[in-house]
Amino acid sequence: MPADTPIRKKPNAYASVVDPDTGYCTPGAFELERLFWHGAPKYTHVNEVWPNLYIGDEKTALDRYSLEKNGFTHILNAAHGRWNVDTGPEYYSDMTVEYYGVEAEDLPSFNLSQFFYPAAQFIHKALSTPNSKLLVNCAMGRSRSASLVLAYLMIYKNMTVVESITQVLKHRCILPNRGFLKQLRELDIKLALEKRDTHGTANKAQKDD
């Protein structure tokens, strides 16, 4: 290779992405991980992280008596399946609960992003129902369930990935695995580009008028 030939660097998963139009910077994966290094509430079984939206663990999901007593109306199990948190509609058949199961593994290689929009839609619909109370659970209530709640806040509440993490960390000790963080980062970039395109289209329409 000639000495003056530029060397192309491979894309860096840890690099930040800047939208030149809005100035918003999607942090790199390492920068996102650093958000969890700071203080968070002491770990407990369940916490309200947004009005009427709770993140909890397996113990919480299995305690039908407490769920009914505390008025839960919807449950999203992010660890659905026989070898995970084995609940399901039948488990809650004696309760007035709407159930949604996501068969996800807490592995960095698992594609959780395929469930971001369906789960967010379920959460949005549940919270739009008067007097609703929603539990999103997985085994520990720290990775899978937290990631789906973060995606919901980004998709429906127009939060950036940093804003959503900051919001949830105020109320619960969470720690999505690195693979999930990268997928949330990709979602953040996608949503930022959509906002930019929408803003650009709106500006063009105003100029045309």
Curated annotation (Swiss-Prot):
Family annotation (PROSITE patterns): TYR_PHOSPHATASE_2, TYR_PHOSPHATASE_DUAL
Q: Which reaction equations make up its catalytic activity? A: O-phospho-L-tyrosyl-[protein] + H2O = L-tyrosyl-[protein] + phosphate; O-phospho-L-seryl-[protein] + H2O = L-seryl-[protein] + phosphate; O-phospho-L-threonyl-[protein] + H2O = L-threonyl-[protein] + phosphate
Q: Which InterPro entries match?
A: Atypical_DUSP_subfamA, Dual-sp_phosphatase_cat-dom, Prot-tyrosine_phosphatase-like, Tyr_Pase_dom, TYR_PHOSPHATASE_DUAL_dom
One MF annotation (Gene Ontology) recorded for this entry: protein serine/threonine phosphatase activity
Q: Where is the Tyrosine-protein phosphatase domain?
A: 45-193
Residues holding substrate:
137-144
Main location, first listed in the record? cytoplasm
Tell me the superkingdom of the source.
Eukaryota
**Subcellular locations according to the entry:** Cytoplasm; Nucleus
> Which residues carry out catalysis?
138 (phosphocysteine intermediate)
EC number(s) from the headed UniProt entry: 3.1.3.16, 3.1.3.48
UniProt-listed CDD domains? DUPD1
Instruction: Provide one Gene Ontology biological process annotation.
Output: negative regulation of MAPK cascade
Which UniProt keywords are listed? Answer: Cytoplasm, Hydrolase, Nucleus, Protein phosphatase
| Gene Ontology CC, one term | cytoplasm
Q: Which family does it belong to?
A: Belongs to the protein-tyrosine phosphatase family. Non-receptor class dual specificity subfamily.
Q: Function, please?
A: Dual specificity phosphatase able to dephosphorylate phosphotyrosine, phosphoserine and phosphothreonine residues, with a preference for phosphotyrosine as a substrate.
Name of the protein in question? Dual specificity phosphatase 29
Source organism = Xenopus laevis (African clawed frog)
What is the organism lineage in this UniProt record? Eukaryota, Metazoa, Chordata, Craniata, Vertebrata
Q: Which gene encodes it?
A: dusp29
